């Protein structure tokens, strides 16, 4: 087989080293030689356009360097995605939108423009995720009205508790009962440090 004479496996491995994503590396390693003239011409034209596109200083965005297949399969089956996973999906959508827009402006690379037109337009989903998930993967207050109200109630209750603890601390300080003038937490509870002889 001519592929072994050309050290095709080593060539594929070298190409994979230049890819930006896990999936891109896998696709590079799975390349097989072809005798189909139309496919050869098409791939050469795509490669030529990609080179031309990069030479004019433009670039592409790839989003997070992770394999989204398992994550998307889980979502398709109705599974839950963690906050950081949702934000990674948002970054992938943002990159796809950028590439679609950027390549759509380039008349010199019609094949790449055609490929970019196959990227789905999901800016509404991107916007929803952006409004609900922080870059750290935390669910934002405005993810839903119910969550917003619940978190507001929790903050108000926490503020009331802090005020009560501070009043008690001042009162016990005047009575010289506290060991240190601070409020700490033990086992998730707010506590005042009382002098051992006063317990």
Describe the function of each predicted region.
Residues 1-154:
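Conserved amphipathic alpha-helical "coupling/scaffold" segments
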